[in-house]
Every structure is written in C-alpha cells, then in structure tokens.
Amino acid sequence: MDRRQFLRTVGASALAVSTAAVVGSRPATAHPGPFEPLGRIDIDGAKEAVVSADGETVFVAATSGYAVVDISAPERQELLAERRDPLSDREDGPFRGLYDAKLDGDTLLVVGPANPIPGAPAGVLVVDVSDPATPEEIAFHETEFPIHNCFAADGRAYLTANDGDRNPLVVLDIDSGDELGRWSVVDADDRWADVPPSMRSVHDVWVHDRVAHVALWDAGTWLVDLSDPASPWVLGAVSPGDPEEIAALTPRGRNRERRTPPGNHHYVATDDAGDLLGVGVESWAIEVDRDDGTTELVGGPSGVELWDVTDPANPERRSTIEPPASPDPTLGGVWTTAHNFDFRDDRLYTSWYRGGVKRHDVSDPTDPVELAWWRDPERASFWTAQYAYPFADEGVFVASSRGVGDASPALYTFPDHAGDQRDPPTLRAEPTTEPLVNTPTPTPSPSGNETAASASETESSTSTTDAPGFGLGVGAAALGVAGWLVRVTSGATESDRRSRPRASTGTPHRVVPASNLSRTTEIAFLSPAGASGEPFHSNPWGSKHRSMSDESESLKERVETWMVGQMPIIQMHGGNSVVRKADAESGEVVVELGGACAGCGISNITAQNIQSDLIMTFDEITDVQVKVPSSGDHGSSTVEGGRGGELQYGDEGPGHF
C-alpha cells in the first residue's frame, strides 16, 4: 500500500458531546444502548494492568505493591489478593515506585522503581501466580538502574534501563536473574552518544517472536532481533530522528523537542501477527512568546500511529488515530495524549488519560474505525486499556485509572462492543472560541535550531488541574505518584504562595508546604558573586519576567544546561524544573522544582514518595537535601545545608557552573 501522511490539527474545542471521530479514524454505527462501564473496583495507586491468558484475572501494578482482581463476573469484580510494601524486611526496603507488571505464563514480574529512588531497592520481583489468590514471591533480581517498564516472554525479562548514559534495553533470565544481553541505540549508531540521554530514553518495549520493539522517545522506535540476546541485530527503525540535529539543539530547543511532536515515542505494541505496529506518542503543548508580544501554544497531545512492519527494514505508516482534544493541552493542563494500548484480532483498545478509553476496528489499518469512546474526565485518568475475554456474544476489556482529584484509582471493566456514551462529558474548563493550539510557521534561526516564535517559552499558570504520572515520576497532586506537574499553583492557596520563604546559605529553612508530596518546591541556591548585571526576576506563580543582563542570562543558561543532563527518566516525559531567578551579580539562582514525572523536575533531584516521605538530593551541585519527614506530617520541607546551599560555577565539571 502507498504510505499515507497525516497532518495533525488541534483546535480549541474540547471533547465533543457527540461521538464524532477525531482526525484519523471514523465512527461506526452505534450498538443499541449506551456504552458504559460494566463495573469498577478501587485500587490505591493503580498503574499498569495485565490480563491472564484465560482473561479472568487482572494483575495491577499499584505503586506501593500489586493487586490481583477476579473479573470473571465483570459487573462484580473481586479483589483476590493485594500485596503492599514488598521487601519491607530489607534494610533498604520496601520495594516501591511500582508502575509496571507483566505476565509470562503463571509468572508475574513486578518492576521498579519507575523513577530513581535513592537508597531503595531496584529490580524485578518474580511472583508465582499459578494460584492468583495466593501469589508467592519467589525471587528478587536486583538491578543498578530503575525500571520504568518491562516485557516478559519465554523465560526472559526485557527491562528499560535508563542509566543516564547509554540507556540500554537489558535482557535477564527470569529464573536465575543472569543478564543475557543488552542493546542500546548507541550500539547501532555511535552518533547517538552525542545526544543527551534524556532525548533517547528507553521508555518501553514490546517483544514479538523475540523481536524487541523499543520505544526511545525522540530517537524513535527500533526493531531489534534478540533471538540471541548476546548478539542483538537491528532490523529497522520507525522515525528514528537525526542524531546530529538533535545533538545540536540548545537547552531550550531540547526542552521543546522533548515535550512536543514529532518524536516522543512512548509505548509500542504489535497485533497478533506482529505485522502491524502501534506507536503511542505522548506529547503536550508549550506556550511560546512571539516577537510581537503575543503568546501561542505550539504542539499538543498526540495519538497512536499504525505502521506496517511486515518488512522491518522499510516500515510504512498506514494511519494515525488522533487524540481527543483538550481544553488545556499543556503539561500542567488536561492530558488527553495517548498512553498504553492493546491489539486483539482486528481491534485496538486505547487509553488517553483524562480523554478516556476508545475501541477501534483496525482491520483496515489505513482507515481505522472508532467503535466506542467513554470518558469521565473529572474522575478517571486512564493508564492502559487491555482486552480481557469473550463472554456471551460480546466480550470484555479492562482499563486502569489513576484517578483524578479525590476520585480513587481504579480498575474498570467495559463491554467489548460498539456504542455511544450517554450524555458524554466535555473537558472544557472555560467556554472559548479561540484556538488553543497553533503551529506557527518556523523561521529558522541562524543556528537552525529554534524558531522566531520560540524566543521564550513559559508555562501557563491559570489551571490547577493535576497532571498524571509517569511515567517519569513521583506524581502530580491528586493523580498519584506519577505526576508531571510544573505549575506551582497546583494545590496551594494564595496565602501559601505569598508566604513561602526561600532557603538561603547557612541554617536550614522551611521552604514549602508539602501536605501533598507532589507540590512544587522552590529552593534558592547561593553561588559566589559573578559579574555585575541586572537580576532576572520571574514571579514564581507565572507572571512575566523582566529582561536579564547578558551575564545573568549566561548563568541561567549554564544552570539549565546542567539540569538538562540530569535525570533522563524525568526529562523523557517532558518534565521541567524552571530557573526562576539567576542573578550573576549576587550569584543567586532560584530553581522551581516542577513536578515532572518524578515530581521534581529535570535537575539532579531524585525523589522517593510512598505516601510518606520525599527525599530530593542536590549532592552534585550543593550538598543540600530537601526532606519531608517520614512521620506522615507533611506540612513542610526542610533544607539541610552541606555547603550551605552554595552553587559553584566554573568549568570544574558536572554540577559546577
């Protein structure tokens, strides 16, 4: 078939009240009666869900543990088992930050932490689930890297290993824990070594007939034959990008590239035959200041691309299923971008965070047909959708939600038929007729790396909507441990915002209310005085800043450059810590730690959040720790000074400016 190109267009309209299809798919004739969930069961911390071979049992990764649910009666789900705080008998336990689980026969793999947790165990928990009601933990294979996602097949575990360097895919023997092999995109083309690891994070993997389909964010998706894991063989790549162009981007350009399409390969899966590959693209819009003083949003949520990989060396895109529209498509807004999905026969089951879940007929991948769509944006933010099993003349699929606000995370069951949702809600926050997302005509800069419209990029501060969870992170306000919130307004009152003091050199200071651990924190670091110049001031709650001197701009750029090189697991989800003040004259730098996937932004911050404690370490820059007491009293954070929060800058190496 001829390769088809699809142009994305995102407008101001929120989710339509009708079931009109979005660009890239068309609606089918509705099934009689409304399309709605058959049932739901609350599961604290719910993230990924996987279904047993008989379709009657669902295993849910639940952040602080895992749960087993019987769905043989889909209207009356039953919790068979729930295990919290595994490995709590270890000195560094418990095992936590658990976002992914996979099945290989009667063996369940639970992996983590999804994002680095200092001093906590990382690895693969092997669980015998031959009796789902009494899961038996039989082994723990420790790793030196966090594991955000994995795949299990034929006695092997395929692990994402974002080590901040080569970011390989690592293959383990499930029984012994021995490493069988590893592969990195740097092995395929050493030019990728010049690209910051955050731009080529290994986010997820799908294996079919021992061919690994590896999602590598802006490095695209690579198909690697791992029949012999010790000798990987690249078969082809989907939209791999140009490593030289990506390496040449400025820090601002890299930040923009990480958040907005194209690129952003997040999740991959194939159909039963392995010939049709789905690539889930996760992206957002960013607000850019134009030269004329106006602002606009560039980018927006992305969808699921369908690729013919019958010939892996020459993949062909057949179509793109576009995402639901969002009233605020920024990182801190209302997420409707693609997340995890599942193929079964000629059907595709997709999740779209607060955009809901959908069911498509993809028997003709050039013309996918939307069969059903259900959403509840005030209560549900869907992490995955998975086919379960046939019953009667229909069937069942399941979807896990991380919850929204006070609504609990949960596992939903849905009928496997076409239909319309009765009185579907919209995602519209405020009535508007103005477009929310535009794509300005690029005007190449002299370097070719930025456009005239991107002179400065800011995050909107008008919404208090919580963001979801990585999915690089510890968690946005009410959406659990996986939030990517960069807005300081979330969850804080105006009096909170006005009263937050800054940490300074010397003694510890209270720095931020933290009744919710995903709240944004602000720390001011003091460095030796630099060249004189006008301070850079930006209202930390979102107002515009005034001009910076060249010296202060240079200092800010150096801080940003260093931050970009840290925590790839956060960066790959577009998380962003913001340098809110950089004063070369006084040497003061204020960094707003936005809630990227790890709830702490892109700097050398590692976070630990198990509903009880948060530790963020700035060792490489300042020897300062920010801690929330683990007693459960999360009213404040404390800065404990090693060098008193001193920032050194020069050319001494990482962490120095």
UniProtKB/Swiss-Prot annotation:
Gene inactivation effect: Deletion of the gene does not result in any discernible surface adhesion phenotype under standard conditions and mutant does not exhibit a discernible growth defect.
Motif PGF sorting signal in this chain: 468-470
Signal peptide range in chain numbering: 1-30
Post-translational modification, as annotated: Exported by the Tat system. The position of the signal peptide cleavage has not been experimentally proven. Cleaved near the Pro-Gly-Phe (PGF) motif by the archaeosortase ArtA, which recognizes a tripartite structure consisting of a conserved PGF motif, followed by a transmembrane alpha helix domain and a cluster of basic residues.
Key words of the record: Cell membrane, Membrane, Repeat, Secreted, Signal, Transmembrane, Transmembrane helix
Coiled coil: none
Region (Disordered), start-end ranges: 311-333, 411-469, 491-512, 528-548, 627-657
UniProt cross-references to Pfam families, sorted A to Z: LVIVD, NifU
Gene Ontology MF: a single term: iron-sulfur cluster binding
Gene Ontology CC terms, in alphabetical order: cell surface; extracellular region; plasma membrane
Entry's Gene Ontology BP terms: iron-sulfur cluster assembly
Note: HVO_0405 may be the result of a fusion of two genes, one encoding an ArtA substrate and the second encoding a protein containing a NifU-like domain. As a result of the fusion, the tripartite structure recognized by ArtA is closer to the center of the protein than to the C-terminus. However, despite this atypical localization of the PGF motif, HVO_0405 is indeed processed by ArtA.
Similarity annotation: In the C-terminal section; belongs to the NfuA family.
Protein name in UniProt: Probable cell surface fusion protein HVO_0405
Organism of derivation: Haloferax volcanii (strain ATCC 29605 / DSM 3757 / JCM 8879 / NBRC 14742 / NCIMB 2012 / VKM B-1768 / DS2) (Halobacterium volcanii)
